[in-house]
Each structure stands twice: as structure tokens, then as C-alpha cells.
Amino acid sequence: MIDGDGYRPNVGIVICNSHGQVFWARRYGQHSWQFPQGGIDEGETPEQAMYRELYEEVGLTKKDVRILASSRHWLRYKLPKRLVRWDSKPVCIGQKQKWFLLSLECDESRVNMQRGSTPEFDGWRWVSYWYPVRQVVSFKRDVYRRALKEFAAIAMPFKERKERKLKRYKSKRG
């Protein structure tokens, strides 16, 4: 399913833990890392697609996570010309993504990347909140930055937000 502008509807998933870290997954057989993501099927809502992709790619179910937020708008990125399949119709020039911020509500041992028919990932780790913006493939960086910026106030632990406010207060007074 590709829209009239050549973008494939897709969901992006940011899973955070109680320490403000995010789930960072290594693409199967590659050295590249990214957040879980995947296409929205015909007749599927973005939320339904998110839960399906979450299970297929990470092995987690609806009861394992809690939705904290979703992006207000679709965030788009264009594929580099070398990755566009010009011979397929309609031509897909990029992805438009609805992003979801989830909190992990279960033990991390429930993560199982072998649940889908073809594994997307072969490893994962927790990383600092902003780390993915610097590490993801370059053509996705702006979308990652925008999604994480939108979710930052919700995802960052309360303690960290409180410490930042205290620092700002002290610097204004001192």
C-alpha cells in the first residue's frame, strides 16, 4: 500500500524502560541498528499495525507494554535513490510513519525475536534516549530526532526532568 505521493504507510516503535533508556535492535545479519518498524496493511489501523509488528519483530504482546504516546503527525523520510525499486509499481520513494512510545511493562526476558516468520532482528540492547539519533542510518535521522523530541517529556524519567529543572533554576539564580 503506497499513497499518492509515493510513501508507504508505516509504524515506528520506541520502547522505553523505567530508566529512560530505549530498545535498540540490530537488523538480522547486518551491523545496522534501528527501532522496530513495519508497514501498515490494508484495512489496518496504525495501532493494530504497531501491535502486529511488535509481536512479529520483538515477540511482545499488548499485555507486555503500555502506550504512552503516539506522534501527532505522520513523519516522512525518503529512501536514497539507490534503494528505490524503480521497476515496481507503484514506486515507493519513502516511508511515512506514525510513531508510538511504549513502556515495557514485563520482564525483558519476554523479548523473543524469533516469533515472526522471518526474523527482522538478531540482537538488542538498552541505550540512552538520544543515542539512536546519532547511530541510525543517515536517511532516517531527521525522523528519529523529530519522534524522540516529541516524546522526550514523556519518556525521560521524572528524576532526570526534575534534575534538569533544578540546574536551570540554579543557573538563573547564581
From Swiss-Prot:
Motif placement: Nudix box: 38-59
Example GO BP: mRNA catabolic process
Top class in the EC scheme: hydrolase
An example molecular function term from Gene Ontology annotations: mRNA 5'-diphosphatase activity
Disulfide bonds: none
InterPro entries: Nudix_hydrolase (IPR020476), NUDIX_hydrolase-like_dom_sf (IPR015797), NUDIX_hydrolase_CS (IPR020084), NUDIX_hydrolase_dom (IPR000086), RppH (IPR022927)
Role: Accelerates the degradation of transcripts by removing pyrophosphate from the 5'-end of triphosphorylated RNA, leading to a more labile monophosphorylated state that can stimulate subsequent ribonuclease cleavage.
Entry's family note: Belongs to the Nudix hydrolase family. RppH subfamily.
Name the UniProt record assigns to this protein: RNA pyrophosphohydrolase
